[in-house]
């Protein structure tokens, strides 16, 4: 048994063959794993001192920040880690849109399931501090889900956000990261089953073992991201949270603008610019489903027989517009709901879906074999 375990570790962590020409864009998965582990570790420590009750939730957070030894450090590391997880996830998806989704459909789908779990976990975690923005954000989202029969009552324990809501959210926020961790192992299994991609976009025989060659590249990236992580956690260089969330809940006073965390802003822009809440919910779900459909591109192209040629390095024009429209929605999500921003939001939603659907059309790939130039 011990021999098999050692052999498994050597096969998948040391001798795993990787393409010779991969670069820092392939670091994001490793960095995500490290930051996600830090999130679980700090979350377990915070959960041991948190009280999931309306009367004590806000004060338990203040107790952790002000009275526990290094409690403020764990609290801000957990908050910064959430932003960093989504930042790295978006970069990881960005790299996958250019290099991986067509070749590794199983890894792509499992990764998107992890992304969906991250979204749910982060949202319910945003409610737990029980600040002013947490309460009203939870109220808006749960009202949005009222179009689904009985879901709000089951999720909130009543018709409004109340004490049963925060208890259920706390349990889900504690359990879902471990569910995501299990799917991470499945994601790695599918990746190792087919092998990693590379910037040239096709399989090559020029491969080297993961250890020590590419591990040193991952460690270098980890050192850089760790410095940024600690600086942000300790000094708070970039204000990531809304100041209204430092105010205790007042159910009779609405904030000037209900704004979620920055990593939810693209989806919030879709909800804000669509007048019907049910239509907005459908648009948000469809935006995630569109990413899942990209894994079916090979099957769809057997039906749509329409091909295009872009370039040797395969920077697809629809994918570029797809990404630009997503980041434009991120900017629109933090703006006040004025007419001009609502108009821009609707235009970028149309561009987002049209470019994403256009990317589903397979294009002919033109590659140049550079392996003959390598003296190996």
Swiss-Prot record:
It is a multi-pass membrane protein. The lineage of its organism: Eukaryota, Sar, Alveolata, Apicomplexa, Aconoidasida. It comes from Plasmodium chabaudi. Keywords: Electron transport, Heme, Iron, Membrane, Metal-binding, Mitochondrion, Mitochondrion inner membrane, Respiratory chain, Transmembrane, Transmembrane helix, Transport, Ubiquinone. Heme 1 (or BL or b562) is low-potential and absorbs at about 562 nm, and heme 2 (or BH or b566) is high-potential and absorbs at about 566 nm. Component of the ubiquinol-cytochrome c reductase complex (complex III or cytochrome b-c1 complex) that is part of the mitochondrial respiratory chain. The b-c1 complex mediates electron transfer from ubiquinol to cytochrome c. Contributes to the generation of a proton gradient across the mitochondrial membrane that is then used for ATP synthesis. Binds 2 heme b groups non-covalently. This is Cytochrome b. The gene is MT-CYB. Pfam families: Cytochrom_B_C, Cytochrome_B. Heme b b566 binds at residues 92, 187. Its main location: mitochondrion. Gene3D superfamilies: Cytochrome Bc1 Complex, Chain C. GO terms for cellular component: mitochondrial inner membrane. GO terms for biological process: mitochondrial electron transport, ubiquinol to cytochrome c. The chain crosses the membrane at residues 28-48, 72-94, 107-127, 169-189, 214-234, 274-294, 317-337, 340-360. It is found in: Mitochondrion inner membrane. CDD domains: Cytochrome_b_N (cd00284). The main subunits of complex b-c1 are: cytochrome b, cytochrome c1 and the Rieske protein. GO terms for molecular function: metal ion binding; ubiquinol-cytochrome-c reductase activity. Belongs to the cytochrome b family.
